[in-house]
């Protein structure tokens, strides 16, 4: 409803361009058929999971943008962000990198709730902003763009190890039970192709 309201506002006020902030999560699970997600990739999302609402809402938002492009002649661009990090992170953030840093600052070992083999793209927040501005200013109407930097792709266990080493702590693996696991993303490999 929020995205539709913003699109209606943009049409009503003759916006020059509408940017819909999307996410790498729209790609769903990597089934091993690609190394990197390009903007045309369509992965599997199990809609019968606790976390399905977020990636599905982003997919629906993108589809709604395309409808407004066609039906209302609205100029739209879709930057797809990946996991960002930097000085804007909050103590209350529940993302893995935030929790790792929080534990390190508190002088505690870093606890991984998986084997840590998830392989993700990360983007420094200033680079994410630069990518966003580039898409707004230079992107083509109706196109989606991955905001990513291959140099920042890393396995979760390696990221945890870097932070733990810097803090003089250890990485501890505590695999979750099924109830706790239900709240986590099923994606194990989400590396974006940011070349577009």
Indicate residue ranges for each PLM-predicted region.
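Catalytic helix-loop patch of NAD(P)-dependent Rossmann-fold dehydrogenases
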Residues: 1-8, 12, 16-17, 25-26, ...
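C-terminal substrate-binding subdomain of Rossmann-fold SDR/epimerase-dehydratase oxidoreductases
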Residues: 104-196
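Hydrophobic alpha-helix immediately C-terminal to the catalytic Tyr-X-X-X-Lys motif of short-chain
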Residues: 60, 64, 68, 100, ...
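Glycine-rich "substrate-gating" loop/helix at the edge of Rossmann-like oxidoreductase active sites
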Residues: 50-54, 82-94, 114-125, 149-152
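Solvent-exposed, non-membrane alpha-helical residues enriched in polar/charged side chains
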Residues: 7, 66, 98-102, 133
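Short, glycine/charged-enriched secondary-structure capping and boundary segments
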Residues: 32-37, 91-95, 99, 125-127, ...
């Amino acid at each position: 409803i929020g995205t539709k309201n913003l699109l209606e506002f943009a049409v009503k006020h003759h916006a020059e361009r509408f940017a819909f902030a999307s996410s790498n999560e729209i790609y769903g699970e990597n089934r091993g058929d690609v190394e990197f997600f390009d903007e045309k990739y369509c992965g599997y999302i199990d809609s019968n999971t606790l976390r399905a609402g977020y990636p599905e809402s982003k997919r629906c938002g993108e589809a709604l943008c395309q409808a407004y492009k066609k039906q209302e002649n609205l100029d739209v661009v879709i930057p797809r962000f990946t996991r960002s990090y930097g000085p804007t992170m909050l103590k209350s953030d529940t993302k893995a990198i935030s929790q790792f840093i929080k534990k390190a600052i508190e002088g505690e070992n870093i606890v991984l709730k998986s084997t840590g083999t998830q392989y993700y793209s990360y983007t420094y927040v200033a680079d994410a902003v630069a990518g966003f501005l580039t898409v707004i200013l230079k992107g083509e109407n109706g196109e989606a763009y991955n905001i990513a930097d291959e140099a920042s792709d890393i396995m979760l266990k390696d990221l945890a190890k870097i932070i733990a080493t810097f803090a003089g702590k250890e990485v501890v693996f505590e695999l979750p039970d099924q109830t706790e696991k239900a709240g986590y993303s099923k994606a194990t490999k989400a590396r974006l192709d940011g070349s577009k």
